Amino acid sequence: KDGLARPGTARMLQWLERGIRLDPKHPGACHFYIHAVEAVHPERAVACAERLAALMPGAGHIVHMPAHIYIRVGRWADAIEINRHAVHADAQYFDGPHTPDAGFYSAAYRSHNHHFLTLAAVMA
């Protein structure tokens, strides 16, 4: 609310950055790093954003995550493209023959991908 990082944020960033140095392709570390830096220093997560979607191409939310960075740094075309892939990944999963109850994911995350796609398209 005041624009300041919460206590422990610097330490958390150290751990995430250490994890990324040890394994730059760790999808969890990149995912949480994007969330951790997107508001104030999105440029710090560009490298993670550029590799994350390919690490788990069938996981719509993970595929979408680079858009959090691309939108913040003005990479509108990349945000459009990545969200198209995220929407497709979700459709493949949820429209498949063994679809579980989508619950919260379908209500929130699937629409979130569409919202980001729309925002990027409007800004492009």
Regions flagged by a language model, labelled:
Residues 17, 21, 50, 54, ...:
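Amphipathic alpha-helical segments of tetratricopeptide repeats
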Residues 9, 42-43, 76:
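TPR-repeat structural position
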Residues 92-108:
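Acidic, Ser/Thr-rich low-complexity linear motifs
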Residues 36-37, 70, 121:
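Residue at a conserved register position within TPR or TPR-like alpha-solenoid repeats
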Residues 25-27, 59, 93, 110:
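Residue-level recognition of tetratricopeptide repeat
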Residues 30-33, 63-66, 109-110, 114-117:
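TPR repeat positional signature
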Residues 6, 39-40, 73, 124:
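Structural motif corresponding to the intra-repeat A-B loop/turn of tetratricopeptide repeats
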